[in-house]
């Protein structure tokens, strides 16, 4: 009996052990199937050579955008900062003192030379004129009487009834009266002139500014307080300076065209305000700044330029014919100077050193190092290496903005 019990106990233990082993094997197979990567056609098997996955992939080609160098006739300009100045500017003041009786202009009005601008109280000057005329009449009467007496003295002197001294005294009295007449006439002219000055007229044609004094105020003659300022607005001048090293270009260009074209742009250097011509060049260079002053003159029927306005100036000097031009984005700067990335027929890039003739916000004129019809990289230069093959991509066109029909109708 005891042997049978031991046999059954051993048999039970063996069965339990087999069940545990079978469960462990099943768990291991389940875990292996879930963690193994899916097999694809490209996955290495026993039938393929043994090599790493990373070695079977090539790095992607860097995408770039390109532009083609062109050949153009490019005008060359010298740029400068300028200030608008009126060709003529007059501060209108009164020549005589008195109360301001009237103003005959509107602020900002265009006036012509000789137009009446203001009136000073004329009555004091009318009184002075009347006094001068009265004094003239008095002295004329005195002169007439002195001449009659002189005629009598001359007759009496022939009969020796008056002395020669008395005759000479009477002749001097006549001359004295004649001198008084001359003084009186000058006084009349002065009084008439002062009366004329009481009416203030425009000395030049131009635009009046804001009035500086109101009607009713007492004005002193030659006062430092102006009545108004008149600026000639058509044409106007722009004063600007250039470095002395640019003077030779200006002199050479003026030999072919004394009136070089000049363009005035706004403060932001974007909007063209007026077109004019170079008017004059100063006769000396400022030793402190190393610059020379120039003046350009601009006709302006629309009055786009105002005195003391700040403008950007572009002075035309020459035209580069058949120059090689590339976009500004294609030009790069390195330790050795300017260069561009050129793309060949196999879409491989190479670094090419170039010399720049001129440059603006949009284009670069190449002096040497690049020919026309070569492809240059304009975007994606940061990822390029010498001889690398690139993928040329086209920039996406901006999406057209759709207009809400309701909003457009309201607008």
UniProtKB/Swiss-Prot annotation:
GO terms for molecular function: efflux transmembrane transporter activity. Residues 35-64 are annotated as: Disordered. Residues 1-26 form the signal peptide. It is found in: Cell inner membrane. InterPro entries: CusB_D23 (IPR032317), Multidrug-R_MdtA (IPR022824), RND_pump_MFP (IPR006143). Residues 35-55 have a biased composition (Polar residues). The keyword Membrane applies. GO terms for cellular component: efflux pump complex; plasma membrane. Belongs to the membrane fusion protein (MFP) (TC 8.A.1) family. This is Multidrug resistance protein MdtA. It comes from Proteus mirabilis (strain HI4320).
